[in-house]
């Protein structure tokens, strides 16, 4: 059920779009797309992207949800739940970056409480996997020069250390783990006999979540036509990580090996240390399935290896074919403060543009709308070609010029979006 507040927001968004005067040659979108608005500088860019790069070319009325922090607070975060359920129904969503409040934000916005991460809420409701991959521009230097193709990290963002129970052991004693089944005898394991103080932790995962993760990874690899690697430390965690390894292998052999063979791609399990070394020596061009902690760490390492967090895509998918995209960076608070002062900003909008094109491209694939798929591809090409032609925001100019960057070397926020529109109109 959609809350009354969300219905009102959706209605207002539809009226706004319908009031605009656009070309009659726009590409018609018949399938639903859920749009989730966000916060601060990314919210400002979001409106500009829609008005200059999306709505002039695409005839679409998104199902709109305002996930800006003030509205999440006003709805007691119900709007986030409504948005997640809407994505589940529509299959396609596109999200602007949002604030996850800490104590300082609670005070700044006068919040009722410290609301949870909207990404986490959406991910849990959809039981999805987050895939992060780079947008590669030939003229931007790479920290890992050999990475010529994308490395896409698929993170199993469920359980493990992130749902663990940990505590400090203050003195000697026996640490035990007990599982009490609903039927049958309890299972008791002695973990350690402490002679003094220390620390302890217990964590878990579920077969259903690992299975859904495996399906998402295999399906995403097929969509990208890239080989898939799963990394674990099953030589040490023989039961825990062994479960990941066994589930992936069983599902691959039963459901995906034939399709992988037809595409000339493959699946392979590797130890995490071996996989890290392989990734650094490779040229890229694969999907890397990681457990929760590994994915958290490796996704940031990979992002920096390609040169810029501003050129990273983020897609949430699940085994049911749900697809929700967003930029992998935050709300760019520092730039927003400058914007509030009336100062010029040069904020990189590429990842936010790709959030829209990824969602619309996937909608086009589901609806067999070839014009929409081509629009998405051409708009992405316009983003890359503009950068490769020397038109970019300050963060990317610094990657090339370093401390020698001058104002003439980069465009401001709106100038870059305008330049992308200019390049798109040449390409289409």
Swiss-Prot record:
Mn(2+) binds at residues 273, 296. GO terms for cellular component: mitochondrion. Residues 1-27 form a transit peptide. It catalyses: D-threo-isocitrate + NADP(+) = 2-oxoglutarate + CO2 + NADPH. Binds 1 Mg(2+) or Mn(2+) ion per subunit. NADP(+) binds at residues 98-100, 105, 281, 330-335, 348. The record marks 162, 233 as: Critical for catalysis. It is found in: Mitochondrion. This is Isocitrate dehydrogenase [NADP], mitochondrial. It comes from Dictyostelium discoideum.
